[in-house]
Amino acid sequence: MASRARLVAQGVAIGLVALLFILLAWSLLNDKGGDLAKKANRGDRPVAPSFTLERLDDDGELDLSSLRGKAVVVNFWASWCAPCKEEAPVLEEIWAKGKQRDLVVVGLDAKDFRPDARRFMRRFGITFPVVYDGPGGTTDDYGVTGFPETFVIDREGRVVAAFVGAVNGEDERVRLQSAIDDALST
């Protein structure tokens, strides 16, 4: 009798663990980013958190507020992030086409090592400005939940749209271009 009760208890325990695993997987798959991303994608246009960070592509620092009057695409990435590698050429293309239209792409490397980030930049031929947020303070301010995440900011410093995950599929690229056009029109 005791072995039957033990089998039932083990079955219940396994069932609970499986249920928790399923709930965790569902939660991760349906995560659409932090509050800032959710507000932007609802159409609220929250003010983009300001930052002043060390540049990896050049000397000095980059202050987001110095870009006021331009549309800005801020892409959060890390050298160890596989989807970031797929997305890098897309962002470089957007930068090459958009800089004549008052569009600035800013790469924000976080939770990474500087030498690894610079190798990533060389490997993928990144020419847009890149800043370093080593421990992730700015990443936390934006509510970034994973890499990559991309925020489109209008000329007035408000977040027009946010993209959780790589922007490399056709649908995502169309949505991103639409958000950029919207940001440039303000």
Task: State where each predicted segment sits.
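Thiol-/selenol-based redox modules, centered on thioredoxin-like
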Residues: 152-186
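Active-site loop/turn elements of alpha/beta-hydrolase fold enzymes
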Residues: 78, 110, 133-135
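N-terminal targeting signals for export/organelle localization
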Residues: 1-50, 54, 186
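Short, internal strand/loop/helix patches
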Residues: 106, 118-156
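Conserved redox-active cysteine motifs that mediate thiol-disulfide chemistry
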Residues: 76-93
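A short beta-strand-turn-helix
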Residues: 50-72
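Conserved helix-turn-beta segment immediately C-terminal to the redox Cys motif
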Residues: 70, 88-108, 122, 173
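Short pre-active-site segment immediately N-terminal to redox-active cysteine/selenocysteine motifs
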Residues: 70-72, 77-80, 146
